[in-house]
Swiss-Prot record:
Phosphoserine PTM positions: S19, S83, S86, S89, S92, S358, S536
Annotated organism of origin: Rattus norvegicus
Record-given protein name: KN motif and ankyrin repeat domain-containing protein 2
Subcellular location per the Swiss-Prot or TrEMBL entry: Cytoplasm; Mitochondrion
Modification after translation (UniProt): Phosphorylated by casein kinase II upon estrogen stimulation. Phosphorylation induces the release by KANK2 of NCOA1 and its translocation to the nucleus where NCOA1 can activate gene transcription.
Tissues showing expression: Expressed by podocytes in kidney glomeruli (at protein level).
Sites of Phosphothreonine modification: T170, T331
SUPFAM superfamilies, per database record: Ankyrin repeat (SSF48403)
Biased composition (Low complexity): 434-446, 506-516
Bias type Pro residues, positions: 420-433
Length: 847
């Protein structure tokens, strides 16, 4: 049963008013809030606000005032509704039996203040009028007795709570009867409505929070729009196209119309399309297809190139002899003239029955000697030799010089049988004093005469000057030796081989004769005749590798012949020497790298960075492999140095002093390995930097303290090294000198050599130590005596700790050395300086 509560006290804020029950003729105050069955009180403005939100009329927020619990209701006078149906939802008719409705507006003081400030709120007035009208209608309607009839609430007909009919109101005569308990469905419906209203309110609050962020974004976008507009106007003013287009954009740029009112204005329109819609192939696929086409073209070009090379080789079958033949063609040109020496170029080897032809059609005497071998050749090597031979003449004013270039092929066994074919016919040359061989006379008499005259030298001023130079010359010393061939009753073959020509290429001059040519052999073995002079390339600046060497101009060969005047005499070797059989093979990579470096040294901009790096790496690896090993051969090093000098003097300087990643040069490695023959070859080049420091801060002179001197040649080599460099140089690490290092390692021979080169014995390192202190500390008595024998040796020097050499010896327990120092200090005897260096080898020989 719904219980109607009548309170006689007036509603707060409206004093003097009584309840509607006390004044039946007076209209009751309009209700302004409603209490829910579970203790909450809802404001009518809030309900109206929720209803407006559902209908989408407004987004304004209406403040919601939450009422305290039922126990905290004010006790003052007020107007109470007589039914729980007031201002409740029409769909929840059962809720009117479970709660009280407090409808006085004076309960919320803020509303009174609001009315006082801004007057009457129209929305509140409409709500109140609506509620008052409904109350009047319900009061005028006939009321039925019973507990189920309740006075309808004014708020039950609001637009926000509709949908379900009202239950019969409670009669007014019921008084304070007990209200009917609300049903569960009514409560659930109210809860759902409240939850929905709260959810909508939360969503609206979140949207309100986003308003400042959106306003900031809007301002940023407006600023960007303004900047883009300004930029667009400036670009249009300057005549530049606006913006950048992507790769797939199709843009039509139409020229602007002139300032003519009769012509319509046009504008540029950009249309976005896709590449596949336009039929344009994909960029990556197009590149792949293009690469495939280029690869196909490259393969075809390579095939054509190979075919052309094959045809070129087929068109020149006579450039070299067939594989199963053995041919040697010698071309000799003799020129008479007092001023310069002209040398004929060599012809290539031809077929066995082919006549040899000279490269120069004038003044050439040709001698062709072709032999055929019965057995098959396994290996053949092409060799080129250039020899300079002075020729006898009737007049002493003119000198005839012939340059003989021999191209030979030999088998690996060296025992091929060779027959005597008839010599090739040749026309006698007016400039040649030697008759050519006649075709009808195959006897070797003419050949013997020519060979004898060619190999018999005549003493000249150049040869005398070379003999006077002796071993001081840097020229190539080539040995002339004879190859012994097993005796054969039919043919006797003799080979004269020159070793050391053209940077290490062996050269041979073969003469085939019968057993009757004893006169030719005896002529070559005569004692009064001096040995044959050989062409040198030690100082020749025009030397090139084997391929370009054949067929050079006469001017280049003339320069080579002029440089050959410095060559000393050749020595006749009684037998084969393993050192003479060493061959120098210059790889094509090394040759090309040397030529590239030569270009770079002449013009630093001639090579790219990659080409320079490749050339530098190749030369460095080949040179270090050749000269920096412990078993490096001095002859190979010398021949490479000759080749580098022939290419360029700058190239020689660059290669000799090239260093690895640790700063070590070939001289550093050679001295460390005690390979003094290679050290001498490097020093003889004249471009070796003997004072160059490595990354550790040591020079080659300092590294001699680690080497062991075995022979007198080793001592002479280090003496040459010391004289070329600075023996007083200090290491960058501790400031030690070569003398200090030699004393510390106990190298007596090196100490003697340094003293012979007038080294400063009083130099101090970073700690203030001298060589004498080092000898005293390590207990080297002999070295101490050598140092004390130097008159300039100062034994009173102190180190950083204030210790003298005597104190160092006493601290080390070297009593004998301390006695020597004490005697030197007291007696002050002076020893004679070392005027001459005496080597251990010579001293042992005297004993």
């Amino acid at each position: 049963m719904a219980q109607v509560l009548h309170v006689p006290a007036p509603f707060p804020g409206t004093p003097g008013q009584a309840s509607s029950a006390a004044f039946p003729n007076k209209e009751p105050d309009p209700p302004y809030s409603v209490e829910t069955p579970y203790g909450y009180r809802l404001d009518l403005d809030f309900l109206k606000y929720v209803d407006d939100i559902e209908k989408g009329h407004t987004l304004r927020r209406v403040p919601v005032q939450r009422r305290p619990r039922l126990g905290s209701l004010p006790r003052g006078p007020g107007s109470w509704w007589t039914s729980t149906e007031s201002l409740c939802s029409d769909a929840s008719g059962d809720s009117r039996h479970s709660a009280y409705s407090y409808c006085g507006r004076g309960f919320y003081p803020q509303y009174g203040a609001l009315e006082t400030r801004s007057g009457t709120n129209p929305r509140v007035e409409r709500t109140l009028l609506d509620a008052r009208r409904r109350l009047e209608d319900q009061a005028a309607a006939p009321s039925s007795g019973g507990l189920g009839s309740l006075t309808p609430s004014a708020a039950g007909s609001t637009s926000s709570l509709a949908g379900v009919g009202l239950l019969p109101p409670t009669p007014r005569s019921s008084g304070l009867s007990t209200p009917v308990a609300p049903s569960a469905g009514h409560l659930a419906h109210v809860r759902e409505q409240m939850a929905g209203a709260l959810r909508k309110l939360r969503q609206l609050e979140e949207q309100v929070k986003l308003i400042p962020v959106l306003q900031v974004k809007l301002s940023v976008l407006q600023e960007e729009k303004r900047q883009l507009t300004v930029q667009l106007k400036s670009q249009k003013f300057l005549g530049h196209p606006s913006g950048t287009r992507s790769r797939s954009e199709l843009c039509l740029d139409l020229p602007e119309a002139p300032d003519d009112p009769a012509v319509l204005e046009t504008r540029s329109v950009g249309t976005w399309v896709r590449e596949r819609d336009l039929g344009i192939p994909d960029g990556e696929a197009a590149l792949v297809a293009k690469v495939a086409v280029l690869e196909t073209q490259l393969k075809k070009a390579l095939q054509e190139l190979r075919a052309a090379q094959t045809q070129q080789v087929d068109l020149q079958p006579q450039a070299w002899p067939p594989p199963d033949t053995q041919v040697r063609v010698d071309t000799v040109r003799v020129v008479e003239g007092p001023r310069e020496v002209e040398v004929a170029a060599s012809t290539a080897a031809g077929a066995p029955a082919q006549r040899a032809q000279s490269l120069e059609p004038y003044g050439a005497g040709l001698k062709a000697l072709a032999t055929s071998a019965e057995n098959t050749l396994v290996f053949r090597s092409h060799e080129v030799v250039e020899t300079m031979c002075p020729l006898p003449t009737a007049s002493t004013s003119n000198m005839h010089t012939a340059k003989k270039i021999s191209i030979t092929e030999r088998n690996c066994t060296g025992a091929a049988r060779m027959a005597d074919p008839p010599p090739s016919p040749a026309e006698p040359s007016p400039s040649s004093p030697y008759p050519a061989a006649e075709p009808e006379n195959p006897a070797p008499a003419a050949q013997d005469t020519t060979d004898r005259e060619l190999t018999r030298p005549v003493a000249s001023q150049d040869s005398q000057a070379a003999e006077g130079a002796g071993g001081a010359s840097l020229g190539v010393q080539s040995a002339l030796k004879r190859k012994e061939v097993p005796a054969d009753p039919d043919v006797h073959q003799r080979n004269l081989q020159f070793v050391g020509i053209n940077g290490g290429y062996e050269s041979s001059s073969e003469d085939s004769s019968t057993a009757e040519n004893s006169e030719h052999e005896s002529t070559e073995n005569e004692a009064p005749e001096p040995p044959v002079r050989v062409l040198s390339t030690a100082e020749g600046p025009q030397l090139r590798p084997l391929g370009p060497a054949v067929g050079k101009t006469s001017q280049d060969e003339r320069q080579l012949s002029q440089e050959s005047q410095r060559v000393p005499e050749a020595k006749v070797a009684p037998g084969p020497d393993p050192e003479e059989e060493i061959r120098m093979d210059l790889s094509p990579d090394l040759i090309s790298a040397c030529l590239a470096l030569e270009k770079y040294l002449e013009n630093p901009n001639a090579l790219t960075e990659r080409e320079l790096k490749v050339a530098y790496t190749t030369v460095l690896q080949e040179w270090l492999r050749l000269a920096c090993r412990s078993d490096a051969h001095p002859e190979l090093v010398r021949r490479h140095l000759v080749t580098f000098r022939a290419m360029s003097a700058r190239l020689l300087d660059y290669v000799v002093n090239i260093a690895d990643s640790n700063g070590n040069t070939a001289l550093h490695y050679s001295v460390s390995h005690a390979n003094f023959p290679v050290v001498r070859q490097l020093l003889d080049s004249g471009v070796c930097q003997v004072d160059k420091l490595n990354r550790a801060g040591y020079s080659p002179i300092m590294l001699t303290a680690l080497a062991t001197l075995k022979t007198q040649d080793d001592i002479d080599t280090i003496l040459q090294l010391f004289r070329l460099g600075n023996v007083n140089a200090k290491a960058s690490q501790a400031g030690q000198t070569a003398l200090m290092l030699a004393v510390s390692h106990g190298r007596v021979d090196v100490v003697k050599a340094l003293l012979a080169c007038e080294v400063d014995v009083n130099m101090q390192d970073e700690d203030g130590s001298t060589a004498l202190m080092c000898a005293c500390e390590h207990g080297h008595k002999e070295i101490t005596g050598l140092l004390l024998a130097v008159p300039s040796c100062d034994i009173s020097l102190t180190d950083r700790d204030g210790s003298t050499a005597l104190m160092v010896a006493l601290d080390a327990g070297q009593s004998e050395i301390a006695s020597m120092l004490y005697s030197r200090m007291n007696i002050k005897c002076s020893f004679a300086p070392m005027s001459d260096y005496e080597s251990p080898a010579s001293s042992s020989a005297e004993e």
